Curated annotation (Swiss-Prot):
Residues recorded as bearing Phosphoserine in the entry: S312, S335, S338
SMART domains, sorted: WD40
Gene: Strap
GO molecular function, one term: U2 snRNP binding
Any GO BP annotation: negative regulation of transforming growth factor beta receptor signaling pathway
CDD domains to which the protein is assigned, alphabetical: WD40
Function: The SMN complex catalyzes the assembly of small nuclear ribonucleoproteins (snRNPs), the building blocks of the spliceosome, and thereby plays an important role in the splicing of cellular pre-mRNAs. Most spliceosomal snRNPs contain a common set of Sm proteins SNRPB, SNRPD1, SNRPD2, SNRPD3, SNRPE, SNRPF and SNRPG that assemble in a heptameric protein ring on the Sm site of the small nuclear RNA to form the core snRNP (Sm core).
Phosphotyrosine carried by residues: Y342
Name listed for the protein in its UniProt record: Serine-threonine kinase receptor-associated protein
Length: 350
């Protein structure tokens, strides 16, 4: 019997979820951060969606959010003309980086020493986080607001996207290496370090390019306008979501559509695979995050393949606020399937 995809629904946000990012895999699992127009980015356990805490301090919509590799720091980009860096264990704000316009995107270097930002003022900024009083380095060249900016090639290069252009920059010389022009607005961009692959979405197209040369690799066409796409870590699958409220799963090698799912009640703004490839997360206009299994029916996280009569139907209650100490934090995130906040029983039934 075919297994039914049952996503885990993560509630808590009150406005559209516009960005999300996973950390790397740490000794305590991996983590997920979400950016929302409610101005309150949230941190969750990545494999279960369990809420850990909310970063409080922005005074406007948060457009971008990211975690460093070991999930000790978070960074957010917001409409209040600031980017903020946070202690992801305590939830404390570490620094506020003032900008001249709305900030849309943030990204840490691999060693977490530098933060890249971009936004409506068309400038890329590089902040030395060990010298918070120092002025950032600035890169100009974009002709419209920057939507996404990412470190690539072991932080030697930078990828950035504005409305209809993707640009590749050399970090050392701060100069443009190459650019790609599109005939419609670029909606998202993802960088895959293994293989140096760049995933770009625009209109109904999902395009793959070399992140080193920007040369095209392949492209797919989706049935609807796509806002975001993500490539599986093993490059087996691609998932994409957009304006028709659906998530599409493709075979990366053949381009064949394998499955499509409808669970959100609004357009999907962001989708990303987890670092282990076992699930992917989606964020929507409906204000929720949903976690989806890559292989439906596999026991993983809160999913357990059970028969209907084995389901107890019990749900746990959520916690509120960051733990008071790092020790409490580690105890919480190390506990299996800690407090759940789901509106329906998270399981896959045979």
């Amino acid at each position: 019997m075919a297994m039914r995809q049952t996503p885990l629904t993560c509630s808590g946000h009150t406005r559209p979820v516009v960005d999300l990012a996973f950390s790397g895999i740490t000794p305590y699992g991996y983590f997920l951060i979400s950016a929302c127009k409610d101005g309150k980015p949230m941190l969750r356990q990545g494999d279960t969606g369990d809420w850990i805490g909310t970063f409080l301090g922005h005074k406007g919509a948060v457009w971008g959010a990211t975690l460093n590799k070991d999930a000790t720091k978070a960074a957010t980009a917001a409409a209040d003309f600031t980017a903020k860096v946070w202690d992801a264990v305590s939830g404390d704000e570490l620094m506020t980086l003032a900008h001249k316009h709305i900030v849309k995107t943030v990204d840490f270097t691999q060693d977490s020493n530098y933060l890249l930002t971009g936004g409506q003022d068309k400038l890329l900024r590089i902040y030395d986080l060990n010298k918070p009083e120092a002025e950032p380095k600035e890169i100009s060249g974009h002709t419209s607001g920057i939507k996404k900016a990412l470190w690539c090639s072991d932080d030697k290069q930078i990828l950035s996207a504005d409305d209809k252009t993707v640009r590749l920059w050399d970090h050392a010389t701060m100069t443009e290496v190459k650019s790609l022009n599109f005939n419609m607005s670029v909606s998202s961009m993802e960088y895959i370090p293994e293989g140096e692959i760049l995933v770009i979405t625009y209109g109904r197209s999902i395009a793959f390019h070399s992140a080193v040369s920007l040369e095209p690799i392949k492209s797919f066409e989706a049935p609807a306008t796509i806002n975001s796409a993500s490539l599986h870590p093993e490059k087996e699958f691609l998932v994409a979501g957009g304006e028709d409220f659906k998530l599409y799963k493709y075979d990366y090698n053949s381009g064949e559509e394998l499955e499509s799912y409808k669970g959100h009640f609004g357009p999907i703004h962001c989708v990303r695979f987890s670092p282990d490839g076992e699930l992917y997360a989606s964020g929507s206009e409906d204000g929720t995050l949903r976690l989806w299994q890559t292989v439906v029916g596999k026991t993983y996280g809160l999913w357990k393949c059970v028969l209907p009569e084995e389901d107890s139907g019990e749900l746990a209650k959520p916690k509120i606020g960051f733990p008071e100490t790092a020790e409490e934090e580690l105890e919480e995130i190390a506990s299996e399937n800690s407090d759940s906040i789901y509106s329906s029983t998270p399981e896959v039934k045979a």
